[in-house]
Amino acid sequence: MATNGEIFNTYGHNRQTATVTKITASNESSNGVCYLSETANLGKLICIPMALRAAMELNVFQLISKFGTDAKVSASEIASKMPNAKNNPEAAMYLDRILRLLGASSILSVSTTKKSINRGGDDVVVHEKLYGLTNSSCCLVPRQEDGVSLVEELLFTSDKVVVDSFFKLKCVVEEKDSVPFEVAHGAKIFEYAATEPRMNQVFNDGMAVFSIVVFEAVFRFYDGFLDMKELLDVGGGIGTSVSKIVAKYPLIRGVNFDLPHVISVAPQYPGVEHVAGDMFEEVPKGQNMLLKWVLHDWGDERCVKLLKNCWNSLPVGGKVLIIEFVLPNELGNNAESFNALIPDLLLMALNPGGKERTISEYDDLGKAAGFIKTIPIPISNGLHVIEFHK
């Protein structure tokens, strides 16, 4: 199983970029031939996440894992375990074409072996590709201890409803206050989810599984829950985050607060109470509060309004915990940058004003809402816990 650092490479900074060769500053090589192949491949990079999505829907990664630890298996062996592919004699051939791109992208390992087959009565030696799991794709296999994988999170970000928003991305440049998701679907994303049960489940499932792996990292590097007696998770979805905190620290009374259509499908957890409401109208009273991946959904004005609602419901000495991927001041070709930059673009496509922020920008939000102190605690690859103290 991958480490937390490897898990947080999910937002795009892994070896998927290996398919892009070096592009020089010049448009022409020394003999005057344009680098058409390299430039054209940039436009074809969509093939990688689409191949990845198909592999997840076909359950490829779990099937490979069932062949054993460090197994190297062929497309034909994998296809033989797919019930829906048994009647397609070309299933293995098409599957191999999907998997070899994932192999070239280091999402799977790929090697070549020789085998003898009978062709027209003659034995012929052919080359066959074998595929195995890498650190990246291990995260897509359900863990034995709890069944968690990142498949649900990746299925959300590659869902057609989400992808359709990116076809309208240029409108944010051309039209003031334009939101690509709203242009594509005629509704705000949370309103859309409230009326579309399938999308509501896809969104909730994606957020829930990623919350689990994030809190495994948070628990390793943050000890601020030790002295808490109560924690209100504002915008907590179906309650996965606060349930994990209460399970780890059972003396904490947990409250999960979100919109009615979200709370209506939230499961019951020991030590957690579900409360429905609108955080922009009023936040319930609480000794401490959690905002995980909430502020990045909204513009500065809405964030300050929400934080003021939190401030009003906190006692003196109470605090709000912000959990977000933080934009580094210096950007680079690294996980810390990509873990913020890629969801930043996703937020720009989905939600009005949604964006990732630097530590100083979060500090400005806290001060504008009345908080007297901001304490950032780095966790892993750009993930931070940021404390706002009243």
UniProtKB/Swiss-Prot annotation:
InterPro entries: COMT-like, O_MeTrfase_dom, Plant_O-MeTrfase_dimerisation, SAM-dependent_MTases_sf, WH-like_DNA-bd_sf, WH_DNA-bd_sf. Pfam families: Dimerisation, Methyltransf_2. Changing H296A: Loss of enzymatic activity. The keyword Calcium does not apply. This is Scoulerine-9-O-methyltransferase 1. The lineage of its organism: Eukaryota, Viridiplantae, Streptophyta, Embryophyta, Tracheophyta. Its EC number is 2.1.1.117, 2.1.1.-, 2.1.1.89. The active site is at H296 (proton acceptor). The gene is SOMT1. Belongs to the class I-like SAM-binding methyltransferase superfamily. Cation-independent O-methyltransferase family. COMT subfamily. S-adenosyl-L-methionine binds at M207, S211, G235, D258, D278, M279, K292. SUPFAM superfamilies: S-adenosyl-L-methionine-dependent methyltransferases, Winged helix' DNA-binding domain. Disulfide bonds: none annotated. GO terms for molecular function: (S)-scoulerine 9-O-methyltransferase activity; methyltransferase activity; O-methyltransferase activity; protein dimerization activity; tetrahydrocolumbamine 2-O-methyltransferase activity. Homodimer. Substrate binds at E153, H296, D297. Highly expressed in capsules. Expressed is stems. Expressed at low levels in roots. Pathway: Alkaloid biosynthesis. Keywords: Alkaloid metabolism, Methyltransferase, S-adenosyl-L-methionine, Transferase. It catalyses: (S)-scoulerine + S-adenosyl-L-methionine = (S)-tetrahydrocolumbamine + S-adenosyl-L-homocysteine + H(+); (S)-tetrahydrocolumbamine + S-adenosyl-L-methionine = (S)-tetrahydropalmatine + S-adenosyl-L-homocysteine + H(+); (S)-norreticuline + S-adenosyl-L-methionine = (S)-norcodamine + S-adenosyl-L-homocysteine + H(+); (S)-reticuline + S-adenosyl-L-methionine = (S)-codamine + S-adenosyl-L-homocysteine + H(+). Methyltransferase involved in the biosynthesis of the benzylisoquinoline alkaloid noscapine. Catalyzes the conversion of (S)-scoulerine to (S)-tetrahydrocolumbamine. Can convert (S)-tetrahydrocolumbamine to tetrahydropalmatine. Can convert (S)-norreticuline to (S)-norcodamine. Can convert (S)-reticuline to (S)-codamine. Substrate preference is (S)-scoulerine > (S)-tetrahydrocolumbamine > (S)-norreticuline > (S)-reticuline. GO terms for biological process: benzyl isoquinoline alkaloid biosynthetic process; methylation.
